[in-house]
Regions:
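Terminal low-complexity/charged segments
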Residues: 1-185
Length: 185
């Protein structure tokens, strides 16, 4: 595909029933889909000779706690041959299980584990879905907007016990409310 406009037309014509919306901005093609179409759309953009998006750059989530579908899943793909990028996205409910891309892109393994660890999003058929960035006994998911800024526990090395211990967070100072409104306006 020579241009993003050509790519957009190709994808819209080939995947008519699987694409909710497309938009070109910032030299990238943004595609909104339903979660059930993720595997089909991903296989198409990876294997089709006119697209060749053979590198998965990243998988992440965005937390919108006020929305009925709390999380927006975002997938970034790169076509080295055409020097183009696609960003796939869809929204899901809080406890929804979504398809894993590890069978299509092995690199999705750690990316999906990171999303699971940070947001609590589960991936169906993932080969090793466990925490990757936080401790094994860690409670909660730190990138959710309802997670406390200080966390629940403090992990530190105890000189007395000669080991790493975990204890509830003790703040030296209470939270302060800052009023940023100007009295002169």
């Amino acid at each position: 595909m020579n241009t993003l406009e050509d790519l957009e037309k190709k994808i819209n014509s080939e995947l008519t029933t699987k694409i909710n919306n497309t938009e070109i901005k910032h030299d990238q093609l943004y595609i909104k889909i339903d979660k059930d179409d993720l595997v089909d759309v991903t296989l198409f953009i990876k294997t089709n000779q006119d697209t060749k998006f053979r590198q998965l750059i990243d998988i992440t989530a965005v937390d919108y706690p006020e929305n009925s579908q709390r999380f927006k899943m975002v997938y970034l793909f790169l076509s080295h041959e055409y020097n183009q990028r696609i960003i796939l996205s869809y929204s899901i409910n809080e406890n929804e299980v979504i398809p894993s891309l590890t069978n299509i892109f092995p690199a999705a393994n750690w990316m999906e584990r990171e999303v699971f660890d940070m947001y609590g999003v589960s991936f169906k058929d993932h080969p090793d879905l466990r925490r990757i960035l936080t401790d094994y006994g860690f409670e909660g998911h730190p990138l959710r907007k309802d997670f406390p800024l200080t966390g629940h526990t403090e992990v530190r090395y105890s000189e007395e016990q000669k080991k790493v211990i975990s204890e509830p967070v003790k703040l030296e100072q209470n939270y302060r409310n800052f009023d940023y409104e100007s009295p002169w306006e």
